[in-house]
């Protein structure tokens, strides 16, 4: 995928109005104390012109991202050094924690001093593209004759690519095997109906245990993306049509709302959902108080470390009865883009192509505990956790999707949907149709 994880209220908000961050599992908010040796040069570097060329004709590209602090020490530098050996182009790493990186990139975007190559969160792309801060990568790929068919995804604005996901962090469904066994359930549920019944049995057999958890805190509304829409996407559904909101006249969306409300009505959802954040949900699952949750694969290591005796596995998100097509799996990613103010765009594009090459991309995916952004990459997960391998197999059976990526004010869209969903669950909105109609009207304002 890690989709959180991904805030200082600050310079970024003032200089890049309208930008919001969708907090998903791979956002990397946790390693804020670690920095690479180049991290402290960030502020100074942003005040200089990007894409510098030395007197001897050597090209140096600045690469600003948060990946370096989340990868094992030295890995990103080693990978970038490989590009230098191959091309002669030097890469200056500007690595900081996720929140700091977002602030610095936003400041650089407003001032026209953005680093040549930047790590991107999908929720930033629309605003940066509309600002003219990041460049049209479709044109660069075309000029290079680059085969974009090898890319697992491309984040587009107005039909043009502005971000390429380098590695993907998947959101499979976690299931507590012990709780299922206690309720006499021998097989994981495959459909919505089976899932509802499983949740009821688990709750009935275990006092103080919930069947399912969904974090619906409006302070961090990514539960709409990762825990609600994952039901829709798994059954082949969509919330958009031609890049615009399509919440009404959408039978599967309506059915998804009714299904989730039905889980609340049945009393099988973990209490405190309206104030729950993703970290709270993970804690509930880790402590054995929830049977099912959809969550980032990025939390696998943490859960196993904090609850070594917990028996759990991954499963596909159940689908609506009768659906036999391929399922969509929610993903988050480390994206990459090129600054419009970069003076060496051709070299910058070559660097992106290098990171997306099958061999390099596979290596990066392994170190990041993620899945590759190049469909031809073959990561060697032979030494990986067995559960990680199982998740990768599930991922390969699905198609990656996250329709919030690249949308204008994506986090605010989640919050608005969240608020309307809560009103419907509580009975303050009369019907599913009314709830979706109200949300559709609110959402359309962001697409004017």
Where are these regions (language model features)?
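Short, low-complexity disordered leader/linker segments with a strong preference
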Residues: 1-62, 85, 139, 143, ...
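Hinge/lid segment of periplasmic solute-binding proteins
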Residues: 48, 52-57, 121-172, 181, ...
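Short, well-ordered beta-strand elements
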Residues: 57-68, 89-94, 116-117, 162, ...
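Extracytoplasmic/periplasmic substrate-recognition and gating elements
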Residues: 59, 81-82, 86, 90, ...
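Extracytoplasmic "Venus flytrap"/periplasmic binding protein-like
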Residues: 78, 82-149, 156, 178-190, ...
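Conserved C-terminal helix/tail region of periplasmic/extracytoplasmic solute-binding proteins
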Residues: 90, 181, 265, 379, ...
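Short, solvent-exposed loop/beta-turn-alpha elements that line the ligand-binding surface or hinge
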Residues: 135-149, 211-222, 235-255, 305-306, ...
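Glycine-centered hinge/linker elements that transmit conformational signals in sensory
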Residues: 198-201, 244-273
């Amino acid at each position: 995928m890690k989709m959180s994880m991904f805030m200082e209220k600050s310079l970024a908000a003032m200089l890049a109005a309208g930008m919001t961050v969708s907090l998903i599992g791979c956002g990397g908010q946790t390693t804020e104390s670690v920095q690479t040796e180049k991290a402290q040069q960030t502020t100074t570097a942003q005040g200089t012109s990007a894409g510098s060329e030395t007197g001897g004709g050597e090209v140096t590209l600045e690469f600003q991202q948060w990946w370096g602090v989340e990868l094992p020490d030295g890995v990103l530098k080693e990978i970038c050094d490989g590009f230098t050996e191959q091309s002669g182009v030097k890469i200056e790493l500007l690595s900081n924690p996720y929140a700091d990186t977002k602030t610095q990139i936003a400041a650089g975007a407003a001032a026209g001093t953005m680093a040549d190559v930047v790590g991107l969160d999908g929720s930033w792309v629309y605003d940066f593209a509309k600002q003219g801060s990041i460049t049209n990568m479709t044109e660069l790929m075309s000029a290079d004759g680059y085969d974009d068919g090898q890319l697992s995804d491309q984040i587009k604005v107005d039909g043009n690519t502005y971000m390429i996901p380098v590695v993907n962090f998947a959101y499979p469904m976690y299931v507590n095997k012990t709780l299922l066994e206690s309720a006499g359930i021998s097989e994981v549920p495959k459909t919505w109906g089976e899932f509802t019944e499983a949740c009821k049995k688990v709750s009935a057999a275990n006092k103080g245990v919930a069947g399912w958890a969904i974090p619906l805190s409006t302070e961090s509304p990514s539960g709409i993306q990762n825990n609600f829409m994952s039901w829709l996407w798994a059954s082949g559904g969509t919330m958009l049509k031609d890049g615009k909101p399509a919440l009404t006249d959408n039978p599967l969306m309506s059915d998804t709302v009714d299904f989730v409300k039905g889980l609340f009505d049945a009393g099988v959802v973990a209490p405190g959902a309206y104030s729950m954040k993703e970290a709270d949900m993970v804690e509930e699952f880790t402590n054995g108080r929830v049977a099912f949750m959809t969550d980032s694969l990025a939390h696998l290591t943490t859960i196993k470390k904090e609850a070594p005796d917990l028996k759990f596995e991954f499963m596909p998100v159940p689908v609506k009865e009768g659906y036999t097509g391929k399922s969509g799996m929610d993903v988050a990613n480390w994206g990459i883009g090129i600054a419009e103010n970069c003076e060496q765009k051709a070299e910058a594009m070559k660097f992106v192509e290098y990171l997306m090459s099958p061999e390099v991309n596979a290596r990066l995916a392994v170190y990041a505990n993620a899945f590759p952004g190049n469909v031809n990459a073959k990561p060697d997960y032979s030494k990986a956790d067995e559960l990680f391998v199982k998740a990768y197999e599930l991922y390969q059976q699905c198609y990656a999707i996250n329709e919030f990526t690249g949308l204008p004010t994506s986090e605010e869209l989640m919050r608005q949907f969240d608020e309307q969903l809560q009103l419907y669950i509580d009975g303050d909105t009369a019907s599913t149709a009314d709830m979706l109609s109200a949300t559709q009207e609110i959402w359309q304002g962001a697409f004017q």
